[in-house]
């Protein structure tokens, strides 16, 4: 199959693009920065609507994957950019393939942060109530048309950027001791598991919004413990921190897609194997 991945140099995008390539698919990456692992790349900016339209119209893609977004702190500092990239951009992609009557579908990434975390758990029918610029712009960007798929979940994964702000990147730079929130509950996927979910979905005809998460949740303390076990040989001291009480647990009720995510321990174990096999991409990580 032919895939176009927007944000191919980012935390999620690089994993998705490289995984799909290694599965034998034709993958074109779209990003501002060149990446070493893709032969086919378009270097451009998400603001360049002409380049985006031409790339999609000429590419004959089966799926366009949107892994572009402005994260929390940056969204607060640049609300207009967040409104466009998080909220408007995914709808622009969806409209483009609909108006041009292309067979191409759009896969979009959303987040548990569309919810405030005060009244969890949340299903696909729950009304987003997040209050920050990031929360609201990500909620605005969710696609619910009859052709696109929105994958809603939190994500963790490696970053080829040593200055990336993701949880795993942060953890890999720690020597300890560090605190892990025991009352902050998490549901999500590794970026590797998300890539697998997207590859599976590309072969299906379903559409709409899916809380793509395993059954059940874990605390951030438990999640850090899995990182510690699989990536640092339990070398980092992690203490329990009960100062944060937050439950953004997602519950999946839409099973139109057959893919079922692996358990959290297996996801992190699989991710550790991936990082070890691709350690040239992550020289800033010291593996235990």
Positions of PLM-derived features:
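Adenosine-cofactor binding site in Rossmann-like domains, unifying the SAM/SAH pocket
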Residues: 29-52
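N-terminal Rossmann NAD(P)H-binding glycine-rich loop of SDR-like oxidoreductase domains
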Residues: 1-23
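Glycine-rich NAD(P)-binding loop of the Rossmann-fold in SDR/ketoreductase-type enzymes
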Residues: 77, 81-92, 125-128, 132, ...
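Conserved Rossmann-fold NAD(P)-dependent oxidoreductase catalytic core, especially the SDR/UDP-sugar
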Residues: 91-129
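Amphipathic terminal alpha-helices
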Residues: 263-288
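NAD(P)H-binding glycine-rich loop region in Rossmannoid oxidoreductase-like domains
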Residues: 44-87
């Amino acid at each position: 199959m032919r895939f176009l991945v927007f944000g191919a140099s980012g935390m999620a995008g690089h994993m998705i693009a490289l995984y799909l390539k290694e599965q034998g698919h034709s993958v074109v990456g779209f990003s501002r920065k060149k990446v070493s692992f893709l032969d086919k790349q378009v270097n451009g900016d998400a603001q360049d609507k002409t380049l985006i339209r031409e790339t999609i119209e000429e590419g004959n893609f089966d799926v366009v994957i949107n892994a572009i977004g402005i994260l929390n702190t940056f969204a607060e500092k640049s609300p207009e950019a967040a409104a466009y990239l998080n909220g408007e951009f995914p709808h622009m992609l969806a409209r483009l393939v609909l108006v041009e009557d292309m067979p191409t579908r759009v896969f979009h990434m959303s987040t548990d942060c569309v919810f405030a975390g005060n009244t969890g758990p949340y299903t696909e029918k729950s009304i987003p109530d997040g209050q920050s610029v990031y929360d609201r712009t990500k909620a605005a960007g969710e696609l619910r048309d009859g052709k696109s798929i929105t994958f809603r979940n939190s994500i963790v994964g490696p970053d080829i950027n040593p200055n990336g702000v993701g949880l795993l990147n942060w953890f890999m730079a720690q020597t300890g001791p560090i605190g892990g929130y025991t009352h902050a509950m998490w549901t999500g996927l590794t970026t590797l598991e998300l890539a697998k979910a997207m590859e599976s979905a590309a072969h299906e005809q379903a559409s709409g919004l899916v809380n793509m998460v395993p059954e059940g949740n874990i605390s951030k303390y438990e999640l850090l413990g899995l990182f510690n076990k699989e990536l640092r040989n339990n070398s980092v001291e992690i203490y329990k921190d009960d100062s944060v009480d937050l439950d953004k647990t997602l519950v999946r009720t839409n099973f139109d897609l057959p893919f079922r995510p692996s358990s959290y321990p297996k996801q992190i174990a699989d991710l550790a194997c991936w990082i070890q096999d691709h350690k040239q991409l992550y020289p800033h990580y010291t593996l235990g």
